[in-house]
Design a protein with these regions (language model features):
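Positively charged, helix-rich recognition surfaces that bind polyanionic ligands
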Residues: 2-289, 293-735
């Protein structure tokens, strides 16, 4: 049997340069700007750009739905196309340099016609934004929008496709029916595995164009879906859908519209079904709603976001010099210098002797000599420590939302010259860790103390364990609640909620105004429904823009970042005190984040960030495959089960007094008079899941140190290797 997923080509080490090409330092903008009056200018730009970007995403999605419904070809969503949308959505006080009816590109004409006919009626009349002096800032926004759309497609397409398959084939309903029909646990487990493998083969057939391997009853449906999802595509580049998604993400845009449309039909059926069921009706249960997704990401939060400011933006917005003034100054200088300056088509100064005065710098000569340094020195306190970084140099660019500022640095060589980016090379600091199962453990490493870490989604973010000199277990925890408290996330959320509940506009609180959007669906791909959403969203935004422009919303974001750095630094110091310095221990991290999942209702797991924190602190960090580390007892290495039930904390379950199994406590639930199962003695310990996991990891690492392989109980069998669809590639075959 072949593997269920095609192998992904390993990245060649020679194509990866192991340092970050750019880095940032973050601070409050008040600490770095010289003239506070310019903060008002920045805030004004932030507000305008935020409005333009919000409208751009909405306009783009509406336009694509229109094209999809009319079976028209989708445009290539690139920087030029996005900048055309900016032009369509905004006005200019100065029309010089704009397009005429004759010179206007065809694509821009089509967008203008769509705007006038369909989108303009959805905009509040006095919400039109002026484009003047924003072109350099919007250039960077166009880059970000294109990147966001491409990443959204390439990262999430397979997940959405798998969800569509599960819902269409009613995988959950079939699984529940098996649970209901088979009381014998062993038989039930076998039936569940059979169903899982059956659905996996369907997923495999829908992610390649090879011969069908699934059950024949699915073949007709699969062939139909291949045509509907992929259109005329008959193969993937490198015969791999993951590779093809990265190489040509926008070829899958229509596919996502189709998938979302089909899921929306199911969503509407469930909604209608639930609306027809009365609360007191015990005969028929309400169906669980499915979650839709946004094909095109929208900016629903209207709090000001970061914008990019470079030297050109400073010149056009801070010096307040119009192009006409620049042209006059150029002519005067040309006359004075007796033709030493040659100007051709208003392009650049050549061989000009310009005084070292910032007001003589313009968009034509800002790159000459020391001009950029003069410019930034004039407006910002560039002598401060925040503008310095070892092996890096300030790149004459910042990102700011009017409260925080991120200062961008570029890598320099030994001579202090910025490193030129090499085509085809990927720059990233080495955060990927080697698996302990594959690592070459030297005698020096074997003598070092081992600390294993089990990362989690909620509760304990990391649970660490190690053996002391007497062989007793030492533990260390860094919890979600500790992080929330130290970053003051919960405090800021409560303050924000209180303000939104107490502030009134037109006799309505902020919460009440926002609640009008709850009956509408921003994720819909139905043209009329999305139009209703855009119209209502624009009305709500118009009312709430002034409220969300208040500084404390952005200040809380900066405070959380600063507090998080302090919390993580404190965690590292406590870890050192508990286990020792980097020269004495090695860390083995569970590979929990190697999937694309995230548990609903919990904050995303941040395992990669934690590994980077420990590596930056100087520790040697390895990964370990977590297979069965929570499932098996660390004493007898037999399976554990959940046993304790308690009242569910979910609001919908509280009314029914529903009980759930506690996930964090495990024990052996099978027992017999001799206390043995299959001649293997069972222990009677009640295990904490995380504590059990780190002890199992310690056992596995010690076994690897002695034998070079994992213990058999923690090794995937041949069948597991063939059918496993986990993204983790480090599977040990020891059979």
């Amino acid at each position: 049997m072949k593997n269920s997923k095609p192998k992904v080509k390993e990245k060649k080490e020679e194509n990866i340069i192991k340092f970050d090409y750019m880095k940032t330092n973050k601070d409050n903008i008040i600490n770095v700007i010289k003239f506070p009056i310019h903060i008002n200018t920045i805030n004004d730009i932030v507000v305008k750009v935020n409005k333009i970007v919000i409208h751009t995403y909405q306009f783009l999605k509406l336009y694509l739905i229109h094209l999809y419904n009319n079976n028209k070809v989708f445009p290539q969503i690139n920087i030029t196309f996005i900048e055309y949308i900016f032009i369509v959505l905004t006005k200019r006080k100065c029309n010089s340099g704009g397009y005429t009816e004759k010179t206007m590109p065809i694509q821009l004409k089509e967008l203008t016609n769509f705007y006038n006919e369909y989108y303009k009626p959805l905009i509040i009349s006095d919400d039109i934004i002026y484009y003047d002096k924003l072109n350099y800032v919007l250039d960077y926004e166009a880059i970000d929008i294109e990147k966001n759309i491409n990443v959204n497609i390439s990262e999430h397409f397979i997940k959405h496709l798998y969800k569509y398959i599960n819902i269409t084939l009613e995988a959950k309903e079939k699984r529940d029916q098996i649970t209901k029909d088979y009381k014998d646990l062993k038989v039930r487990k076998e039936k569940h595995i059979e169903l899982t493998q059956e659905i996996k083969k369907v997923k495999k057939d829908l992610t390649n164009f090879n011969e069908l391997e699934s059950d024949k009853k699915y073949h007709k449906w699969i062939l139909e879906q291949r045509k509907l999802i992929y259109g005329n595509k008959i193969k993937f580049e490198e015969n791999n859908i993951a590779y093809d998604l990265k190489a040509h993400p926008q070829e899958y845009l229509k596919s996502l519209f189709y998938i979302c449309g089909e899921l929306e039909k199911v969503y509407n059926q469930i909604k209608k079904h639930n609306e027809n069921i009365k609360e007191e009706d015990d005969g028929e249960k309400k169906k669980k709603k499915i979650r839709l997704f946004n094909v095109i990401p929208l900016r629903n939060n209207i709090i000001g976001k970061n914008i990019s400011l470079d030297s050109r933006t400073l010149l056009t917005n801070f010096l307040d010099k119009s192009l006409k003034t620049i042209e006059k100054e150029k002519k005067q200088i040309e006359e004075i210098t007796d033709n030493k300056i040659k100007i051709k088509n208003s392009q650049k100064y050549k061989n000009a002797d310009i005084k070292c005065n910032v007001h003589n710098i313009d968009i034509y000569n800002y790159k000459q000599g020391n001009n950029q340094k003069l410019l930034w020195d004039y407006f910002f306190r560039t002598n401060k420590r925040v503008f310095k970084k070892n092996k890096y140099r300030f790149n004459n660019m910042i990102k700011t939302d009017g409260v925080s500022v991120s200062i961008l640095f570029v890598r320099i060589d030994d001579k202090g010259i910025p490193v030129k980016k090499q085509k085809g090379k990927k720059y990233k600091e080495q955060t990927d860790c080697e698996y302990i199962e594959k690592a070459k453990l030297t005698d020096e490493l074997k003598k070092m103390k081992i600390v294993t870490i089990d990362p989690n989604d909620g509760g304990d973010l990391i649970y660490c364990g190690s053996k002391d000199e007497e062989g007793d277990l030492e533990t260390f925890r860094y919890t979600q609640n500790q992080r929330r408290l130290e970053t003051r996330t919960k405090k800021y959320m409560k303050i924000t909620e209180k303000v939104n509940n107490e502030t009134k506009i037109n006799n309505q609180t902020i919460k009440q105004i926002e609640s009008t959007l709850s009956i509408l669906n921003s994720k819909t791909v139905n043209y009329e429904e999305f139009k209703k959403y855009v119209l209502e969203k624009n009305k709500v935004n118009k009312i709430l823009y002034a409220h969300y422009q208040q500084e404390f919303f952005r200040k809380f974001k900066l405070n959380r970042f600063i507090n998080m750095q302090k919390s993580e630094a404190k965690m590292i110091e406590n870890f050192k005190d508990k286990f020792g310095t980097p020269d004495k221990i090695i860390i083995v991290f569970g590979d929990h984040d190697k999937g694309s999942h995230n548990m609903r209702g919990l904050e995303p797991s941040i395992c990669k960030k934690f590994r980077r924190i420990f590596k930056n602190a100087g520790y040697k960090v390895f990964l370990i495959n977590e297979f069965r580390t929570s499932k098996l007892c660390n004493c007898c290495h037999q399976e554990l089960d959940k046993f304790l039930t308690r009242a569910s904390s979910k609001p919908r379950d509280k009314k029914k007094n529903k009980k759930t199994l506690v996930n964090g406590l495990l024990k052996h639930t099978v027992s017999n008079p001799e206390g043995e199962l299959n001649q293997i003695p069972l222990c009677t310990i009640i295990h904490n899941r995380d504590k059990n996991a780190v002890q199992n990891m310690l056992y596995i690492v010690e076994h690897i140190k002695k034998t070079g392989s994992r213990p058999e109980a923690y090794t995937r069998k041949e069948l597991d290797l063939q059918t496993n669809s986990s993204p983790c590639k480090t599977l040990i075959n020891n059979c």
